[in-house]
Amino acid sequence: VMFGGLTHKAAVDAVMSLVRLAPGPLDRIFLADSGSVGVEVSLKLARQVQIARTAARGGTLTRTRVAALRGAYHGDTLGAMSVCDPIGGMHAMFSDSIPQQIFLPRPPSFAADEADVETWCSEADEILDTHRDDLAGIIVEPILQGAGGMWPWSPSCLKHLRRRADELDLVLIADEVATGFGRTGKLFACEWADIVPDIMVVGKSMTGGYLTQSAVLCSDELASEVSRGPGGSLMHGPTFMGNPLASAV
């Protein structure tokens, strides 16, 4: 059953619970099938935001790529694979068939000193500034890279990426599939840097592993941009989005 455009009590209850927990203005929710699919949705949403902004300016779209971190892991579907570490990850053999993204250095560790953070920020800035006209957004696993080696990284670097995303008009995506719901000691890992992403993806603990479900959250402002843009809605409709059994769990 396709639940796109329809609703039911279990889905409403699930998303209202998420809204009550979600940081800041993230009160628009798209239910997806899994963490990887949630990442796919977030990438498409970021691109549609840039399509809408470009259309509003009457320009030509160039912002189609995404900046990700070395050491990252975001899933096993095609778009998600494209933002995983291209060398040290498990997807190197598919590199000729996935979208080519931009990669920033792996951030220094959680307890890094100020000098290491500043060095990383300078290196990241150089890459972001070079590709500023090509980028739609930035995607990170906030504070902790999971499958990429359980690497806890500096909250100061995440705060810096939030600031640069604002300066460059980029969409900041937080992949909290593995870090959300208290797994890092705070409800969401972004809280360690005291930032709110433009888009947040959650999964895993959302259903406790009983059934597959994920969610993509954004603000009403961002959702409205997409609704006013070409297409008039988010161009994604998985068959099992809002599955009532998964939503009830």
Protein language model regions, located:
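Conserved N-terminal phosphate-binding loop of PLP-dependent enzymes in the Aspartate aminotransferase
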Residues: 1-249
